[in-house]
Amino acid sequence: MKSHIYILFCLFCSLNTFPQSAQDSVLVLTLEKTIDVARKHSPDALVARHSFRSQYWNYCYFKANYLPSLTFTSTPNFNHSINPVTLPDGTSQYVQQNQLMTDANLSLSQNVTFTGGALFLQSGIQRLDMLDDKSYSYKTNAVLIGYQQSLLGYNGLKWSRKIEPVRFEEAKKSYVETMELVSANATLKFFNLAKAQTNLDIAKFNYAQADTLYTFAQGRYNIGTITENEMLQLEINRLTEESNMMNAQIDVDDCMQDFRAYLGINQAVNISVDVEDAVPQFLVNIDQALELAFVNSPEISGMKRRKLESESAVAQAKASAGLKADIYAQFGLTQTGNELNSAYKNPLNQQYVEIGIRFPILDWGRGKGQVRVAQSQRDMVFTQEAQNRSNFEQNVLKVAKQFNLQPGKVLIAAKTDRTAEHRNEVARKLYILGKSTILDLNASISDKDAAKRNYISALYNYWALYFTLRSLTLYDFRKGIALTEDYNSLIK
């Protein structure tokens, strides 16, 4: 609903700049406005927000593992059945039981990162009701302290504390990067429509010129100043431009539909893009760009995370292959009684210790093989990440160098466009005066059209490189500030 209101507001503001006869359902968008809409309403932007929220709550879950947790449990049960009961003399006898067991337990637990174990504190009460004779009794655990620990095992808490902060930092950087890529994609859609509309304008202009020249040539042919072949060539030019105009209209419709879909515009609104001729004139310090990319890019954080994950896998494989030992110990105070008060009087000591050991004697090299596989995977990851880092560095350098050249290319393309238009006008006048051939005229038309298209492409290349460089470095070189987002607003 908000996206529709925003688009209709833009539509209202844009349409007020046109006469009523020409403004029906026409939305004029600049590149800046296009990017603003795309960052709010495009499918890529919405997916990025949901992805970040998922990573955020995953990080919250990770942090909660290192905080105390308080849990209440109760498992009341009713039993009316015949069960074997051991008598004082050691014999067993089937006895009908009709009883109700109710309990309540409160447990406070805390994971210990350094050891990977867990410390817990419990307090609970049980009540047993014998329904046949209407008697009851209580059992209490006033306080119970316990600890469980896997000795020589894999410490997942320690490795998670190394990996998860890096993963969340990567998620934050990835969101900023994705929004810059959304800007780059919006720029692509914008200039695709700009190119299509430029081609349509070219086709309309060329058709009008071809129609005028063909009409003029008919008169010259009637008085014998041009050959039939030349007049037929002009007729072919006219028909070709008419066909080009129809094809260009189809391209405009297709690009406009794609453009609307990406911006989240569901209404059948005609859009006209307003391409600004000027581009910001500034150069990027290549060394600074490379340094910022290594600090800010999520690619670098991802490399670090994957290395840590591979080392964690090796540690887990080693722990699984060797000696395993688990210890469980609890100490507390307990008592029973026929009344609740008596169940808390003179509590008795309660101790319980359990140690479990597992050592593989014969596994046919399975444990060793798991370790070797994990080590090979780790070495492969380290090799791949070293290559990825080198490729990333080369990509940053290439994009920065290309961007620094692009403002000059835009100026050259603009000058070429103006010169080609002037040359076409001169060639047309010379042809009308009979001082030029149809071949020269056609060549000037082709050069004019190519120059206009090259100019639009040069503008697109500038902005594509601009947003690509921002996505690689997460830095705005125009304003000299780091790119960031209001992450708190994303999780609301």
Where are these regions (language model features)?
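Short sequence motifs at beta-strands and strand-loop junctions characteristic
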Residues: Q96-L100, S137-K139, P347-N349, A450
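Bacterial Sec-dependent N-terminal signal peptides
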Residues: M1-L27
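A glycine-/polar-enriched beta->alpha junction
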Residues: D36-L46, R53-S69, N105-S137, I145-K162, ...
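Acidic, low-complexity, intrinsically disordered peripheral segments
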Residues: F18-D24, T71, H80, V279, ...
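Amphipathic alpha-helical coiled-coil scaffold segments and their short linker/junction regions
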Residues: I35-R39, T91-Q93, I226, E230-M231, ...
